[in-house]
Amino acid sequence: MVARSKEGKAAKIHTLCMDGEHPEDIKLRFESGRMRVQQRKEKSAHSLYRSVPSPDEVDTIHRLFLESKSLKAQKDAILSGRVESIDALGRSKFKWMKNTIYKNVLLMHPQERNIHGNIFGGYLMKTAMELSWVTAMCFVGKHFPVFLSADKIEFMNPVSIGAIMEFTGRVVYSYSDKFVIQVLAYHIDRETNEKTATNKLTYIYQASSSPEFGSANDLDLCVNAVEVADIVPKEYEEFVAYIEGRRALADYKQSRSSNV
């Protein structure tokens, strides 16, 4: 979390006191938090909006580009975005990224304001989370989505009372039984219809054939995991989102493995 002043600048907070019954445990948790902050800064510095993809990611983008061109040449049923069998490409099923999009447009009311008179960030997070869940349910169809992690939450611009907000959720990456959903929040200018991004949130889910859950200490929280459709991007912006999703899932697996 961060503390902000009403001008949107960093606000000074109290220094954390690490005295207590178990000081070593407290210091260990503090150091873990410090390392997470440092890792977050490093990830931000290597964002795809600030630096070029790695050589491996460039190869992935090119491979996906060639596959998407081949898919475009298939019959109309494939172009419609429905799950289809593509044996020649080695994909049992796929979905175009653009066909996983779901949206929600809301008017921001004063009861959701914070102490600075803007919309409370927790309300925006709640709205985005609900949309990600709907997106996940529609993506897995007859199966059950299992929430695993909120990977990254970005606040780019404050949201004022009375603002018209558009929330857009989509599946940006999938691998085996896991998939990544990205929710973008935009402020819509009612006079110009221009959209300004205010929030970006990333969620990781798993698909299950039943609503049963495993242990919270396991990497997989569901006991009857099922594979989901491969996500195929078309436009360059979708390729960037795909790589972001792949990074998010890799980070999740690494963090869970180190904690087990």
Segments (PLM) and residue ranges:
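HotDog/MaoC-like acyl-thioester-processing domains
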Residues: M1-D56, I161, V172-V260
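A compositionally biased, intrinsically disordered/low-complexity signal enriched
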Residues: V2, I61, L107-M108
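Extended repeat-based solenoid scaffolds, especially LRR ectodomains
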Residues: K41-K98
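A conserved, well-ordered hydrophobic junction motif at loop->secondary-structure transitions
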Residues: F94-V134, V140-F147
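Generic structural detector for well-ordered beta-strands
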Residues: V105-L107, E154, I204-Q206
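Hydrophobic beta-strand-centered segment that forms part of the acyl-chain substrate-binding groove
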Residues: Y123, E130-Q182, Y186, T196-K200
